[in-house]
Amino acid sequence: LDLPPVPRQALFPPDNPELGREEFFKLYEGKFEFFNKVQTQAFDTLFHSESNVLLGAPTGSGKTISAELAMLAAFRDHPGGKVIYIAPLKALVRERIEDWKHKLCVVLNKKLVELTGDYTPDMRALQGADIIVCTPEKWDGISRNWQARSYVTKVSLVVIDEIHLLGADRGPILEVIVSRMRFISTRTERPVRIVGLSTALANANDLADWLGIEKQEGPKSGLFNFKPSVRPVPLECHIQGYPGKFYCPRMATMNKPTYAAIRTHSPEKPAL
């Protein structure tokens, strides 16, 4: 849809202040005044509904801020609830922790906890946390015994980053987590919202069906799958194929053409 950019003021609208919070408005002060195209498209569903969402968009297109919109909605609508942010790698977990230390802990006064193989907080820290950033394996282990861990039943939002890795080694763990959280929601009669973040997907409809996402046309649809062309920084792709069954001879065959391709397409820019 060709929508005008949503202003930052939408997080604390003067005419309907109950729809937001003043601290939400201050969260992005000095960073931007308008949300980008991807965030604008998904804003209403993320911030003004409790629908499950699948957001597929290229790297660097603002998916993290989109996830933050869902987190802000959870803080507003479910005070005392917990937000779980699941990232596939410890490095990504650490990146989120460093980014949110000031943004969410200082500005919003939320308690943030890291849960990975390197960091295992005690029970008191987990019970007092508003946001738990973790790897799939750690949350799988924690949530298995959910009946004995009351804080698991307080989860109101689960954000799964890089959910397209469902088809990789960690796929079965993500499947178990989603199924278990939906089961917990049914048993406790407390809604648990699931937001999946991904690159652009070829089978977005299948993944949306599995997540229980509404796909109807209109502003409340929970499926957003953007083309690579929506990147803020355009990306050109040039693909050359080389036959070869064995790795070393194939690499040797590709050496000179790779150098020639760099000289042709990126003669004055860094190359890796």
Please place each PLM-identified region on the residue numbering.
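Helicase-associated low-complexity/disordered flanking segments
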Residues: L1-T45, E50-L54, A148, A271
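Walker A/P-loop NTP-binding motif
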Residues: D44-S51, T64-P79, S179-I184
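Conserved Walker A/P-loop ATP-binding site and its immediately adjacent core
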Residues: T64-I65, K82-H102, D140, T199-N203
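Conserved SF1/SF2 helicase motif Ia
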Residues: L72-E95, S185-P191
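Conserved helix-turn-beta segment of the N-terminal RecA-like "Helicase ATP-binding" lobe
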Residues: L92-E114, D209-E217
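Conserved motor-coupling elements within RecA-like helicase/translocase cores
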Residues: D118-V133
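SF2 helicase catalytic motif II
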Residues: P136-D140, Q147-E189
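Conserved interdomain linker/interface between the two RecA-like ATPase lobes of SF2 helicase motors
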Residues: R193-L272
